[in-house]
């Protein structure tokens, strides 16, 4: 269990718009060195929806390769596409991440409770991982739920 502040990591990009992994690792290490107990890669300020799934997979692996313990990470895995959300979630859990943070469907506003339940049921069935812990990402002011 992670106790304490869990912070998203800013996602830095190079001039050519490619992902800057070395700076990403430095930012993560700086957050931990300055009191964060855990990290939420691809959280709010992490530009999750601006980064392709394969690039996110490489970035998460890059954090681990730099020496960051995956058990203190709860990466944002939610995307508009449930198939990519499942793939990213499985990858994070296979790496040993503490859990995953995901969004409810957000494109169409006013989804019914039954619709939300069905979405998360399909997501959980699709991930089908023994160490699955889902942290729901809920921004009241942004998602209008």
How would you describe each model-predicted region?
Residues 1-7, 11-144:
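Active-site beta->alpha loop and helix N-cap motifs at the rims of alpha/beta catalytic domains
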